[in-house]
Amino acid sequence: MERSQKSARKKKKTSKSGNDRSIRSERKSKQKKPAGEKSQKSRRTRKSRGPKGNGFTSRETIQPSSSGQSEGTTRMDDQKDEKKDDKKEEKKEERKEEKKEEVKEPWSEEEPAKRMVANGFFTTTNVGGTFKQTDNFKTPMDSCPSFKNNMHKIRAPDCPIPEEKLVKLTNGPESFICAAKITVPDFNRTMILTQVPDLSSAPDIADFWRMIHQESIASVVIAVMPLEVTLQQILPLLSGTYSTYGKMFVNNKKVESAVGMTEYCLEIFPDGCSNSLLTTVYHLHNWRQKRGLEVVTDLVATMEKVMKVNDNTVLMSMNGTGRAGTMLTLFTAMLQVQKGKEVNAKETLASLRAERCGIVDNIDQFGTVHRSMACWFKNNSTNEEVQRKVVEFAPSIQ
């Protein structure tokens, strides 16, 4: 009995220990995972820990950051390449512009310029001989009654203006002004030569502006030295200022200055009239009376501007004959070339003097016309022979 109980207890213990072993083995088997699962779990664990895990960084955590760096570097490289390409394009455009500047465009006046050079327009003997051979026709005083009756208003009494050539003022107490209308070939606008008004007479200054407004003058070119005339007595010199001359209101809207010329943009209208006129006044201030002009660059540039405007024009000097007449002769010659015609200096001067006696005082002023034409040709012509001839005629032309 006792033996059977002991054997039963042994069997029970044995089964219990077996059960314990099986339980333990199951637990161990549960803890043990396939190698693949273990490595994936470890990688996930390492990845989740990242840089916080005792300074350890797995291969997977490095890859995203290195990829971001490579993308950023690629973008920077692309931007640098784009900048380089932009700079290359800018340099190409600059080279194109430089080439355009180097290669002059064909000048439309090239053919008449070549003919004038070939026919000896730019020779010293031609200038002197032509001037001496040109008559200075003077109109008889008896055929100039208005001129004769207003001698107190005239600076050059030896150069009478025919009645039909005088500018007649309207809407004022006086109708006379010492100004002549000139017919210029191929110029279908009004061209007037006039003297500087008497600065001691306020009515004379007012009459000048009355004429400008009445004749709708777009361009006024004044050739006087500062010592000859205080220009401020004739017009407001500062931008934004204005002056009144009798019933004429003159407003200075803009001023531009060059070396030998100052340009004024003026608004002109009679008192009580809203019909204003915009006029540009060009003042050439380095040209002495009875002399030629030494530096002709600004004179040529001014005549080019007047031709471009192609509107009613006034040319003014102290007496309205010498320097004003020289400017008129130059303007006429340039206009003829622009129309494709060859200039005959003798015929041009003679026809203008028939309009207004006293035009061009002397050979120096006539030489100014030729040197100005040489400067104009030099600045525009691409023909080698034209360039050579004008430089020979006026080596230091400027």
Swiss-Prot record:
Biased amino acid composition, Basic and acidic residues: 18-40, 74-114
Comp. bias regions, Basic residues: 1-15, 41-50
Enzyme class: hydrolase
Key word Hydrolase present: yes
SUPFAM superfamilies in the cross-refs: (Phosphotyrosine protein) phosphatases II
Family designation: Belongs to the protein-tyrosine phosphatase family. Non-receptor class subfamily.
Tyrosine-protein phosphatase domain: residues covered: 125-376
Enzyme nomenclature, EC number: 3.1.3.48
Keywords associated with the record: Hydrolase, Protein phosphatase
Name of protein: Putative tyrosine-protein phosphatase C15H7.3
Domain of life from the UniProt record: Eukaryota
GO MF annotations in UniProt: protein tyrosine phosphatase activity
Cited PROSITE patterns: TYR_PHOSPHATASE_2, TYR_PHOSPHATASE_PTP
